[in-house]
Amino acid sequence: MTNHQIVAVILLRPEEMLLCHRAPARRANPDVWDFPGGHVEPGENPFDALRREVAEELGAELRGVDGGPVLRRVDPQRSLDLTVWASRRWRGEVSNMQPHEHDAIGWFTAAQVAKLKLADPSYLTVLRRLLSA
């Protein structure tokens, strides 16, 4: 069975990162804070998918990523392959362009992130490292 390739990005600004709250009605990972992103379409490369998802979900322009992936998760049971990058290289005013997917978005400090219900609790280590860099 082929894994569904999923890409996501952690948008950063000084001392804060952007997270999206997945709507409670979502089938996968409802009612948790997660990174903006989505599925790579057939024939699409991961970076183009990442740029498309940022534009669709947040109305911002992703100009690049800060090096290699900061997180990689493969879940054979759900046939998912998730790759996450971080980026300070984006522009535009971020807003929630798809409220049916995310019922809220927000900028958070490391202390605030520690109090959130994340899609995966192990994300906290990565997020703290990014904000301390």
Place the predicted regions along the sequence by residue.
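Short secondary-structure boundary/capping segments
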Residues: 1, 9-10, 24-25, 32, ...
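Active-site-adjacent beta-strand/loop module that shapes the phosphate/pyrophosphate-binding cleft
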Residues: 71-94, 106, 111-112, 129
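Nudix hydrolase/Nudix homology domain
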Residues: 26, 89, 99-133
